[in-house]
């Protein structure tokens, strides 16, 4: 590899400093006439000229430039033009007279490619995200497995996170869904429906929307507290008053859901959205319970018992009302996204716990079964003990008494601590990324609505109370603030802000 490195420095223009990656240390680069010394040829990448050596590139025959070097060398052999492929298959344009080949790519990223040709070690460009850098090196025919070990961990971690979040697809889906649901031109009362939709779905769009959002949160909290008090059966509580309060809360939730349903145009898509499914599940048990109780008047005792069990199960679903707060909480939505995106890590964690529980419960059972009045009466009982021990809960209802059993218990607890700690860093990184991505999107939507409102006022010659420059400045400041918080969160979680 040293010989190929010297071959790349075949031009007298490379007698300068070799101390910086950003300087032209790998090839000749200049504004003047291209150099064609010996086996050299010139590539023009993003407006910057680089003189490369065919001898150096021959060590990498499977890359784009390695193939181009073979084509250029073949052109210099007399009588070989008929069997040689066109260089335009490998570059965007070519000037055979000056032996110069053009590429419409980033010249800054190309320097890292040249460093790979010179040393055989590929480093990651700081200024590019992982997916953009991957696109660059794939274009030049370099595999990402060639990335040097000093950059590999950061690169693959950021790449996996970017692919999981899938920013582009998520943004496009949200925009198309936004446009579909916000098309109020079709149907009756478009202006009223649009204003009502803004109040229901955009808490920051107006004072009325903010008041509605606060009232909605209050009703959710009150309904949850009311559900808990109804189950307490305290003597000083008026159950009739609690039932009336339950009816009021359900009426609010029903009206909220019906208004949203009437506002949208694509109602099938509306019913498929997770927040709306949660809203529906929060109110359906109440009406199904009323229906079941009204139809059970003429049933037998056995049938009444079965109906009572159904009613109890339906009442349990009222706890789903807590999930309605996800409409007003970015943190809850981020938690849901994190759980769905970390299913592999969660599955791996459950697998580790299952293996540990199976092993330690069996060992503990055979260590304790000979003790009189032992609580380890069977292996399933030992499963419960191993589960509470590995998760560091330790209820104490089942505990070992022998020395051997206590040693096994110590190993079980220690294994649980180690197993639970393994995926925490990954899940924390995913949660932080989801949270700040949602915050950035919310900020972008708010600023877009403000600019749209300002543009509408300008078009109608209405009184303008804000300045366009101030709106833009607030947008930039909010984005910078969120980026700063994301960077600080990454550092505190053990990550590296090298990529931000």
From Swiss-Prot:
Pfam families: BTB_2, Ion_trans. It comes from Homo sapiens (Human). Residues 168-189 are annotated as: Disordered. Residues 232-238, 298-309 are extracellular. Residues 1-210, 260-276, 332-345, 428-500 are cytoplasmic. The keyword Phosphoprotein does not apply. The segment S4 is probably the voltage-sensor and is characterized by a series of positively charged amino acids at every third position. It is found in: Cell membrane. InterPro entries: BTB/POZ_dom (IPR000210), Ion_trans_dom (IPR005821), K_chnl_volt-dep_Kv (IPR003968), K_chnl_volt-dep_Kv8.1 (IPR003970), SKP1/BTB/POZ_sf (IPR011333), T1-type_BTB (IPR003131), VG_K_chnl (IPR028325), Volt_channel_dom_sf (IPR027359). The chain crosses the membrane at residues 211-231, 239-259, 277-297, 310-331, 346-366, 407-427. Residues 168-181 have a biased composition (Basic and acidic residues). This is Potassium voltage-gated channel subfamily V member 1. Potassium channel subunit that does not form functional channels by itself. Modulates KCNB1 and KCNB2 channel activity by shifting the threshold for inactivation to more negative values and by slowing the rate of inactivation. Can down-regulate the channel activity of KCNB1, KCNB2, KCNC4 and KCND1, possibly by trapping them in intracellular membranes. Detected in brain. One of its GO terms (cellular component) is plasma membrane. A motif (Selectivity filter) lies at residues 392-397. Keywords: Cell membrane, Ion channel, Ion transport, Membrane, Potassium, Potassium channel, Potassium transport, Transmembrane, Transmembrane helix, Transport, Voltage-gated channel. It comes from the Eukaryota. It is a multi-pass membrane protein. Its main location: membrane. GO terms for biological process: action potential; potassium ion transmembrane transport; potassium ion transport; protein homooligomerization. Disulfide bonds: none annotated. Heteromultimer with KCNB1 and KCNB2. Interacts with KCNC4 and KCND1. GO terms for molecular function: ion channel inhibitor activity; potassium channel regulator activity; voltage-gated potassium channel activity. Belongs to the potassium channel family. V (TC 1.A.1.2) subfamily. Kv8.1/KCNV1 sub-subfamily.
């Amino acid at each position: 590899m040293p010989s190929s490195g010297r071959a790349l420095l075949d031009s007298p223009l490379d007698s300068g400093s070799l101390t910086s990656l950003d300087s032209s240390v790998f090839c000749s680069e200049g504004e003047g006439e291209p150099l064609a010394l010996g086996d050299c040829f010139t590539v023009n990448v993003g407006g910057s000229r680089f003189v490369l050596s065919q001898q150096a590139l021959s060590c990498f025959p499977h890359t784009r430039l390695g193939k181009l070097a073979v084509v250029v060398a073949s052109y210099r052999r007399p009588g070989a033009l008929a069997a040689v492929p066109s260089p335009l298959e490998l570059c965007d344009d070519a000037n055979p007279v000056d032996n110069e080949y053009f590429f419409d790519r980033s010249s800054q990223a190309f320097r890292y490619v040249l460093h790979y040709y010179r040393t055989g070690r590929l480093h990651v460009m700081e200024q590019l995200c992982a997916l953009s850098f991957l696109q660059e090196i794939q274009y030049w025919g370099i595999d990402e497995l060639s990335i040097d070990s000093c950059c590999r961990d950061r690169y693959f971690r950021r790449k996996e996170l970017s692919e999981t979040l899938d920013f582009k697809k998520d943004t496009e889906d949200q925009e198309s869904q936004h446009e579909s649901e916000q098309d109020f031109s079709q149907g009756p009362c478009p202006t009223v429906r649009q204003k009502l939709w803004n109040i229901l779905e955009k808490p920051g769009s107006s004072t009325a929307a903010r008041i509605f959002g606060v009232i909605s949160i209050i009703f959710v909290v009150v309904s949850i507290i009311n559900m808990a008090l109804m189950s307490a059966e305290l003597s000083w509580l008026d159950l009739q008053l609690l039932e009336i309060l339950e009816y009021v809360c359900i009426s609010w939730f029903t009206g909220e859901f019906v208004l949203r349903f009437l506002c949208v145009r694509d109602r099938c898509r509306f019913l498929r959205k997770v927040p709306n499914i949660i809203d529906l599940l929060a109110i359906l048990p109440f009406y199904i319970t009323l229906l079941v109780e009204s139809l059970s008047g003429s049933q037998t005792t056995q049938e009444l018992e079965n109906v009572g069990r159904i009613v109890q199960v339906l009442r349990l679903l009222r706890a789903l009302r807590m999930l309605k707060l996800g409409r007003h909480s970015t943190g809850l939505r981020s938690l849901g996204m994190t759980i769905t995106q970390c299913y592999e890590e969660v599955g791996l964690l459950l697998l580790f716990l299952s293996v540990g529980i199976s092993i330690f419960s069996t060992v503990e059972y055979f260590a304790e079964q000979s003790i009189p009045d032992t609580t380890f009466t069977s292996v399933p009982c030992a499963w419960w003990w191993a589960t509470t021990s590995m998760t560091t809960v330790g209820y104490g209802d089942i505990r070992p008494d022998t020395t051997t059993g206590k040693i096994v218990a110590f190993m079980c607890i220690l294994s649980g601590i180690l197993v639970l700690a393994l995926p925490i860093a990954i899940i924390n990184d995913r949660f932080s990324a989801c949270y700040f991505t949602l915050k950035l999107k919310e900020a972008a939507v708010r600023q877009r609505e403000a600019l749209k409102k300002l543009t509408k006022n300008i078009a109608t010659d209405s009184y303008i109370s804000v300045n366009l420059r101030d709106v833009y400045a607030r947008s930039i400041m909010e984005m910078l603030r969120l980026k700063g918080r994301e960077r600080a969160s990454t550092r505190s979680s053990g990550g590296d802000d090298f990529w931000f």
